[in-house]
Design a protein with these regions (language model features):
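Transition segment at domain starts
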Residues: 27-53, 86, 131-148
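Solvent-exposed strand-loop boundary residues in beta-sheet-rich modules
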Residues: 78-82, 118, 132
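An anionic, turn-rich surface loop/hairpin at beta-sheet edges
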Residues: 80-107
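N-terminal signal peptide c-region/cleavage motif recognized by signal peptidases
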Residues: 23-25
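Bacterial N-terminal signal peptides that target proteins for export
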Residues: 2-14
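Short amphipathic, basic-aromatic surface patches that mediate peripheral association
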Residues: 58-64
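Short, exposed beta-strand-loop hairpins at the edges of beta-sheets
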Residues: 102-127
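Beta-strand signatures of extracellular beta-sandwich domains
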Residues: 73-77
Length: 149
């Protein structure tokens, strides 16, 4: 192998490594984790926000235990204090809504709560360090910036 080929291989390897590093950082930037759930019934685990394309998701951690209540649900609170009741944690056939897609009408998420819809009681909550902007919120924000020009 000539010196020129060795140089090309080394250079291409460095470019590939840089690309992989940048790609992994961009994926990590779209993932946010809450504090630990704290409450009367939900007090283990955390929730993670992720994004797949234009869909925002919430997933609970492996440590999370579904509270033993009649109708525990996902619930989120935005930075303005608006509360959005979302899917049940347990569904038919002993299945679980471990990951849910956030509806487009939710523009940011400050807190993730576990709520019992039957008893109308908050079972526990976890907060993000700062509110997480959803894809629909980013779209609204960019449109309002364009209108202000």
């Amino acid at each position: 192998m000539s010196g020129r080929n060795v140089f090309k291989m080394g250079f291409l390897s460095a470019v590939a490594a840089t690309g992989l590093f940048m790609a992994s950082n961009s994926f990590a930037a779209d993932s946010h984790t809450t504090s630990k759930f704290e409450g009367v019934k939900a007090n283990t685990g955390m929730a993670t926000h992720g994004r797949q394309g234009n869909n925002d998701t919430l997933t609970w951690s492996d440590e999370f235990k579904i509270p033993d209540t009649p109708a525990p649900h996902w619930q989120v609170v935005d930075s303005k204090g608006n509360v959005f009741l979302l899917q049940r944690l347990k569904i038919k056939g002993d299945k679980e809504n471990r990951t849910i897609t956030i509806p487009s009408y939710v523009h940011d998420i400050a807190k993730v709560q576990i709520y019992c819809a039957w008893a109308e009681a908050l079972l526990g909550e976890a907060s993000f360090a700062k509110p997480v902007m959803t894809a629909s919120g980013e779209h609204m924000h960019s449109n309002s910036m364009a209108m202000g020009r």
